[in-house]
Amino acid sequence: MNKIILTDCDGVLLNWEGAFTNWMSMRGYKVDENNRREYHMGKRYSISSEEKDRIVRAFNESAWMKYLNPLRDAVYYVDLLHRKHGYTFHMCTSLTTDEYAQKLRIENIERLFGKTAFTKYIFCDTGADKDEALEPYRDSGYLWVEDKFE
């Protein structure tokens, strides 16, 4: 049995939301207090869907991708599963198709989780659905870890 875990990145491994909140604040955007817990960033900031798409893409293609903090206990559990139990991870994320932003994301993952825990990186465009990218894993029996419930 291959000991592989498929995982999303933002909201599972990295604190994308916290970094995005700081990035937006530095640019003068304020969270709509009535929508503070909203998953959809357009609603959270009371901006149009088009503006949200443009802003999220700009953030995802920024140098911030190299410096996102890990989410809660992600480093501990990835390390435990990798070193003690022999699992490796394949990451699938809707970051961007920009190759330089992707390199920054990989550098950050390797800095936080080490160079051997993640053996494959799959990048989809900003906000894109991951179904097509995950199709090769259908019926593999691998665990898929995702923060967006659907």
Enumerate the predicted regions with their spans.
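Active-site neighborhood of HAD-like aspartate-dependent phosphohydrolases
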Residues: 1-54
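Conserved acidic residues
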Residues: 3, 119, 141-143
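Short hydrophobic segments within beta-strands
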Residues: 8, 92-94, 145
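A short, structured active-site edge motif that brings together acidic residues
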Residues: 35, 90-97, 106, 112-132
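Substrate-recognition element of Asp-dependent hydrolases with the DxDx(T/V) motif
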Residues: 65-70, 74-105, 109
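Conserved Lys-Pro-Asp/Glu-containing loop-to-beta segment of HAD-superfamily phosphomonoesterases
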Residues: 123-150
